[in-house]
Amino acid sequence: MKKLLILPLALFLLVQSGLAQTPKWVEKAKRAVFSVITYDKNDKMLNTGNGFFVSEDGLALSDYSLFKGAERAVIVTAEGKQMPVSLILGADDMYDVIKFRVAITEKKVPSLVVATTAPATGADAWMLPYSTQKSIACVSGKVKDVSKIAGEYHYYTLSMQMKDKMVSCPVMNAEGQVFGISQKSSGADTVTTCYAAGAAFAMSQKISALSLGDVALKNIGIRKGLPEAEDQALVYLFMASTQMSADEYEKLLDDFIRQFPSSTDGYIRRANYYVAKGKDDQSYFDKAVADFNQALKVAAKKDDVYYNIAKLIYGYQLSKPETTYKDWTYDTALKNLRQAMAIDPLPVYTQLEGDILFAQQDYAGALAAYEKVNASNLASAASFFSAAKTKELLKADAKEVLALMDSCIARCPQPVTANFAPYLLERAQMYMNNDQARNAMLDYDAYYKAVNGQVNDLFYYYREQAALKARQYQRALDDIVKAVELSPKDLTYRAEHAVVNLRVGRYEESMKILNEILKDEPKYGEAYRLLGLCQIQLKKTDEACGNFNKAKELGDPNVDELIKKYCK
């Protein structure tokens, strides 16, 4: 009987000893630990695991594996309350950690303090499991080894037994601060040893400007947060605008404004987004106006906001809306722009002033603005091109227009690159309009080189016209053959091919081409006229006059003089 009493007494003393060693902070700290449930794209349960809060406003840590492939996630607190995971804020798939935000349903939640220093080898450690019961049960052990990861952070080997359901539970130091996130053991040492990634390392995970390309983050379908620094967040926004769906991008804009409420950039970008949506629903324009008004309220430099309002309205008018929204006219754009210029007359504002005046067909006013820009440090190929086109519309002397185009080309990278190559085409056309065909050919050749020969049939046709005018007949012939090759059904190219052959005295070849055209299109009047010209050269006047009369019947406007000359 005495032996039977001894065993329960020994067990009682052992339990009392264990309870005595449990730190006082455990009961409170355990309330910060929660269960995590993740769901896949079909809304089926994907994984379950643990995590814990590290701030009262819902910042939390767990393991990356739990979230991989998840489209949504919820947490269940120690009190049994469910809350959704709202944002992923950073992850590392190598060390299997993730930082995220929970959309908490209370003013604040119980949270743990992350230790700022690593515990020493041999220090006491406690692992806090998730539990919905009021219990101070925890697993105690020692820090067996501390190793460095990612420079200043740590990874821990613990002399501690751990069960599978305790992965991603917090590992605490004697002061009740979390220093590690428990990780699954493997191999022969699972009975006595487990591991923990540093909590400080998990906290260091963040979204950067380039995180849109991060494979680990892309494997999670839950929304991502923004970078903490505003400049990085702006780059992230810019990249997201072309990679996200419209709805996702709108939510991201909302997040940016919540995170940086005093930044005008968020309101301006969202206003531009709303205007794009306004093509289908004009109520979005009201939202854009509200955002611009808020931007003006928070702006330290209001001129930038006025400039962006002007630019947006100008772009809106350029799209030629069927009905104009309220007072969103070129005049309103100009009014906002001049408010910006009154605060700070920056050359970029003057450039937009010129563009708006140009759109209003006030070419004299536009030219005055462009000339101001060209005299400033903002002078560029684009500003000189704008001035050249405006002078051309004002019927200015061709030499003045070409001088401006020369300045435009001079401000392009040399040799001219593909992005600037269209300016060469513009100058080539101006040369052609002013009977400078050889100069036009040089620009066409420079364009061909700038775009690495990536040209179409129209380019070859234009260069052929220049070569023909410059009496470079072989080049003209080569280019028109190439144009026909690229677009064999185009009658203009085929007729031009006949013209070049006619010019170089290849009358039979020209007639062959023209007869093939008439086989495909019997009512093509120009072909009859050209056929007649070939026959005149071959002294076949009667046949030529028959073709001239056929061209006249079909409405060719250029045949009357030929009939007068050869057929009377």
Regions found by a protein language model. Give the residues of each.
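Flexible, gly/ser-rich surface segments that form the specificity/activation loops bordering the active-site cleft
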Residues: 21-25, 108-155, 162-166, 182-193
